[in-house]
Amino acid sequence: MTNQQMPSGHSLERQPLSLLCLAALGVVYGDIGTSPLYVMKTVFDPIHGLAVTESNVIGIISLIFWTIMIVVSLKYVTLILRADNHGEGGIMALLSLASSSVTDRPRLHNILFLIGAFGAALFFGDGVITPAISVLSAVEGLEVATPLLQPYVLPITVVVLIALFMLQQRGTGGIGALFGPVMVIWFVSLGLVGLINIAGAPQIVAAFNPMYAFAFCISNGWLAFIALGAVVLAVTGGEALYADMGHFGAKPIRLAWYGGVLPALTLNYLGQGALLLANPAAISNPFFLLFPSWALYGAVGLATAATVIASQSVISGVFSVTRQAIQLGFLPRMQIRHTSERKIGQIYIPFVNWTLLSVVLMAVLGFGSSSNLASAYGVAVTTTMVIETTLTFFVLRYVWNYPFLLGILVTAFFLAIDSAFFSATILKVAQGGWFPLVIGSVIFFIMITWSRGRQMLVDHLRSVAIPLQSFLESLIAHPPTRVAGTSVFLTANPDGVPHALLHNLAHNQVLHERVVFLTVTYQETPWVPVEQRISIKPLMENCYQITVRYGFKDEANLPYALELCEPHGLVFEPLRTSYFLSREIVVPSPGTGMSLWRERLFAAMVRNASNAAEYFKLPANRVLELGARVEI
């Protein structure tokens, strides 16, 4: 099987289970694995008014532990990991799985797509906050080592982040092999320092009893509700377990969770709780104060490495979601570079990378500390949790055929928990929660504007197109001069004559001896099997209609797709094949459709979209692009 036939995520499945578990530690668990850096510090932030008492500390640790057990272990590891879409996970895969189950109800199908698109848009907000809060919280450990380094925390954070984003264009294939071993050292360190500190206040193990979590909520009332907005930070990154399922498979992710990550996180949170019971003043930075003074600089270095790895996973996820959104028709084409010759899933999108870096630096410099950023973190995460739980209902009911009542009960249980966390984080909108919401809302608005604009453009082109059948019949009545070679006309409308063909005939008065009308369609599925990639329909006068199908995670390569026509008797010689593309120049006009300013935004996106020839891997010296003005 060639590289183009192999789905990018499935090549890892041939590796031994132990290596897959190690790789999963380095990719999947970076985000949730670095949460202990800031969760306890945020919960007991003086601004929240929660006192560092024994009952509160044990109650909070109990709340954190059971939140991890219910949200991560039960919802994601046990339930949602079963919802694989051709082996793939993530919100786009869950969206396509849920929406494909209600295709007979177009209105509901469209609503689900909008909900899923908003969830994907919020992921961009997460892509900003995660690198900012993770790296900043790690570097803040220098303040614990010596207060004299406090003025250097922000500059060091900025330098680390700039270096991280500059690395993206080179790819992480070389150093990526170190991610797993580094995270193993990280999780072992988490568990070890936690265990050592538990010995100083063993009564903290009472937190395993969920009654302490309930008692904390009842006795503290409003303060407990506010604390939920910080407790939820302990499960940020939990969605990565599902998002990265296509790379590693469900079994290695489950084994890595129960065999390494969950015990390490549990011991570390218990250790922080024990430290606070023994020394309430340690709330200034309970994570780094777990370490002996001689190990602080090493701990800061290790934490920085772990947060860089966590950030790398999120950045790669943003690139992946961007490409999926492009192929599902939610975003304009962008320049996509491949950073690995062996794994086609490793991509780099320059525009997204530098835009993301700019906004991340704004977040770091604007919020100034991990405590301030924590207020901005939870809103996008809890909104995504609510969306994924909602989509899961449709999988339970219509894909797995659960009884309606059982589907409602399961969904209601998780929605009640997600909604409690969501409500608590909404309280922080004014303190910074607005930041990821604004990012997500702007991206969502761009997505629906592009999707609506493309539909308007396609509808207009269909309405003015000459029917293909009539055109072919006219070739018999008035045959043009035919020249040697093959012409391939890309068209979104398989029933109409492409504008590029009409322009070519009008100006050159010739037609190639073989003409192909090629339409690319993207399915609501991650991968399309290679045997289903193409369909060929012979037309009259040596003309053919070819449809190429891709999934939203497939790599588009039209010359390779045309090679698949050889068993059907169609051979495309590269030096005798020319590709003709139409490039629409959109002219906004008042009237029906979108508001004029949205049409202008759409026109600007069309102008700045990357070249279709480059996107579809067409040979540059065999492409002719013809423009056409279109009013919408």
Swiss-Prot record:
Pfam families in UniProt: K_trans (PF02705), K_trans_C (PF22776)
Chief location: membrane
The organism's place on the tree of life at top rank: Bacteria
Subcellular location: Cell inner membrane
Family the entry assigns: Belongs to the HAK/KUP transporter (TC 2.A.72) family.
Record function comment: Transport of potassium into the cell. Likely operates as a K(+):H(+) symporter.
Protein name (Swiss-Prot/TrEMBL): Probable potassium transport system protein Kup
Organism field: Nitrosospira multiformis (strain ATCC 25196 / NCIMB 11849 / C 71)
